[in-house]
Swiss-Prot record:
InterPro entries: ATP_synth_OSCP/delta_N_sf (IPR026015), ATPase_OSCP/d_CS (IPR020781), ATPase_OSCP/dsu (IPR000711). Signal peptide: none annotated. GO terms for cellular component: plasma membrane; proton-transporting ATP synthase complex. It is found in: Cell inner membrane. The keyword Acetylation does not apply. It is a peripheral membrane protein. Disulfide bonds: none annotated. F(1)F(0) ATP synthase produces ATP from ADP in the presence of a proton or sodium gradient. F-type ATPases consist of two structural domains, F(1) containing the extramembraneous catalytic core and F(0) containing the membrane proton channel, linked together by a central stalk and a peripheral stalk. During catalysis, ATP synthesis in the catalytic domain of F(1) is coupled via a rotary mechanism of the central stalk subunits to proton translocation. This protein is part of the stalk that links CF(0) to CF(1). It either transmits conformational changes from CF(0) to CF(1) or is implicated in proton conduction. Keywords: ATP synthesis, Cell inner membrane, Cell membrane, CF(1), Hydrogen ion transport, Ion transport, Membrane, Transport. This is ATP synthase subunit delta.
Amino acid sequence: MGSVAVEETIVTGMAGRYAQALFSLAKESGTIDQVASDLQRLREIYRESEDLQRFIGSPAFSSEIQVKVLNALLNKVEITGLAANFIKLVAFKRRLFGLPKMIDDFNHLRDVEYGIVRATVTSAAPLKDEQLETLKGVLAAQGGGKSVEIAAKVDPALIGGLIVQLGSRMVDGSLKTKLNAIRTRMKEVG
């Protein structure tokens, strides 16, 4: 597969600044995992609720209303401490529209801190646990010895082989792509 460069992108923009501030506080207080867990729970609620998505994305609500509604939601789902205070601050500052990106950036900073690289592996059929573990080892070696977390996807249209995405790099070893390349070459020839 050749050497795969793993990038440790620095978070940028408004969402990056908020995420960096939250991450620094979480690291200082030793609560990185708790904050990550709380943010993940909020993200799941956000994904499942179109009403919450509209509420967070709408400038029609005052910051006071957003803080009150989010405070009630956070209490109901038992998100407390640093994560809850952060979310309420974001609402107060009228930056809720950027919350999903802030969560992504926080998770990226956490991964960098813990030496975790995320990979997506797409195959034509589900991979066995042993295959995933072997792939983790290969990707860890390619990624400079970092721990690799794999998100496995299945796409029967690939016919066979794998597509591996590690950071911004992608290696497409699928049979579908190889057959398409052969088809293209045959059209060029004849």
